[in-house]
Amino acid sequence: MPTHRLFVFSACLLASLLTSRVSAEDAAFESSRFEITQLTSDLIQPMELAVAPDGTVFFIELSGKLKAFNPVKHEVVLVGEIKITTEQENGLIGLTLDPNFSDNQWIYLQYSPPDFPGQHISRFTIVDGKLDLASEKLLLKYEEQRKECCHHAGSLSFGPRGELFIASGDNTHPHGDSQGYAPIDERPDKAPWDAQKSAANTNSYNGKILRIHPLSDGTCEIPDGNLFPKDGSKGRPEIYCMGCRNPWRMSVDQETGIVYWGEVGPDAGADGPRGPRGYDEINQAKFAGNFGWPYFIANNLPYADVNFETGEVGPLFDVTAPMNESPNNTGEKALPPPTSAFLYYPYSDSPEFPELNGHGGRTACAGPVYHFSEELKSNVKFPEEFDRSLFIYEWSRHWIKVVHLDKNNDLAQIELFMPQHKFVRPIDMAFGPEGALYVIEYGETWGVNPDTRLIRIDYIRGNRTPVVVASVENNIGKEPLTVFVSSTGTFDKDPNDLLKYEWRLINTADQKAAPKIVSTE
């Protein structure tokens, strides 16, 4: 009985450039020279990332796992796992590396313990590539209500002078009877719906940007320049900025020490008797201050005082002398005057910042400030055109934008980054030691996604890698078999380059005879 052998024809395309290379610094800036490389898709509900000096990319997952992408082996390893609760959007929510990570292997995490109603900010040591749980040094902890959802923020970032910045949310339910305006419900048993207990409370760690200076023994001290005196007489001494709703993603300019964060705003779609419509904000703190929530939003637009028992709408809050008279307030009544948001935009078009126009949801995030370095020897570092630029991004609207800053770190220009590419819900980003940008794309839904990935964005100088497309038709069958292969769609980004094509066959050792190849133009 005759037998029929089944084989698979495989092909690869080798494209070689036949032109001379140009100097890395000679070519003018071209936006088309940005290239995306997918590093891994092995991420499940990723939150934050941090890039080590050796290029290792650490990232955390909401479920409590700390993972690392090895740039040499191109693989993801589990570094460790923290016991957490994920109820009410809690979990492992913050990550940063010590400024001297190469020497001490210290990593900082913000997480939600199952046996404590709040958040822990702790330092751990990585030993032989694994998280040493016994090395934990608890730097700070603060309580939250877990009766109702939400707003935990969680972002961590070091400043240039060794200060650790900690973002905390207002821990307030955004819905209920506030109707998408200021959640200031003072009725009994309604504290989860009152942000005056947290963001506007000088005695609360919630709804804040905190600032401490970790010490080598695992304790911390209060640096100069925070909002309140170090003795705690006017408020928590760790508070750098108050009046925050949900500062979900934060970064610190590593040259100036200026703090940026994205403030996810409330849901009101239009102005009303209770006050202004909802806005998302990008905030900039050149120094300590009150950023207004829940009394003010955007460029200090005031909300109205509301009696939630009767529904009566009272006067607008006084922007010159805000007062917190909520029964849920445990701090000072008289508050510092608010600071306006740096950038802000509603659901609909923004008359103040048309570059941020868009529709649909809003989730403003603040990424890193890029500083170009002549001394950095790298063929992929971002060009000088992005020097002194803040990268902001939108989880809901799928974009990254560049905010160019002037010499005073004020707004100069906003432009869309890589306009030809749609980012799939960017959730965190950081520049690596080589000047490339690392980005986590969360994926399409608020859950576990098949399109989650970690990418690196390089700026390619000189000659660029061709875009290779190889397709195969009729590649499986019985002998004799005619297979059609094609390189249609292959092109070179440098138009004057010539390409050399080479087809190679693999897995042919067990065949009786080498296949006959016929090529066409």
Question: Could you say what each language-model-derived stretch is?
Answer:
Residues 474-483:
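Short, solvent-exposed loop/linker segments at the N-terminal edge
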Residues 26-30, 90-92, 170-415, 424, ...:
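Beta-propeller domain segments
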Residues 38-43, 80-87, 140-147, 239-242, ...:
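Surface loop/turn motifs at the tips and blade-to-blade linkers of beta-strand repeat domains
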Residues 120-157:
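Asp-box/WD-like beta-propeller blade repeats and closely related beta-sheet repeat scaffolds
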Residues 498-521:
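Surface-exposed, flexible coil segments in extracellular/virion-facing regions
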Residues 486-495, 506:
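Acidic, Ser/Thr
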